Amino acid sequence: NIFLELPRQVGKTTSALIRYLYIYNFGSANSIITYLHKDMKASKENLNDTKRLRDMLPPYLQMAQEFSIVNGKKKKMPTTVEKIQNPITHNVINTLPSARNAMLASNLLRGKTITMLWADEWAFIKYNDIIYSNGMPALNTAFRNAARNNAPHGFIITTTAGILSDEAGVYAYKMVQNATRFNEQWYDLSYKDLMELIDANVNSIFVHIRFGYDELGLG
């Protein structure tokens, strides 16, 4: 579970898109990936950008066939502005709308089987606190099941810094303060030691990764 905070226009969204395209085409099977953004239009745009990146691959790597064989029968795979399904791996990428009120926010993720959730511009998603608190029980169950199958799983947040006069920005800021801070010394740790370090934080499941313009060679 990663909270990635980068300045604008340095590729944080594109990096996430590439990661999820790899998982969708090659890195898993029968997984459900869900894109969340501050509005449905932006969620759809991220899905459309995923398709555009896929179309840049050589044809034999795109896996964009219209039909698949499911239980011995030919079946047309869904390909819409809100959802796609891989005909080979049967992975799915869904999009979610933002919540217009607290009630919709409380039900947005509740009860859903999602093995990978990506929340883009989390610090600007209204009612993000309600979405998180009500959605995590179902998400954690799906994550544990995926982990038992050695399948990719988790919650990735990508965002620019929020506005501290806004409730969504304040909640995102609190999440950052509670998260485990990434540093380059982790590259020298074993996987076991790394997980023990992350699990020792009882206040957060997230690793906070933050780079500024200067650290990215752009300052």
Describe each region flagged by the PLM.
Residues N1-G219:
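Phosphate/NTP-binding elements of NTP-utilizing enzymes
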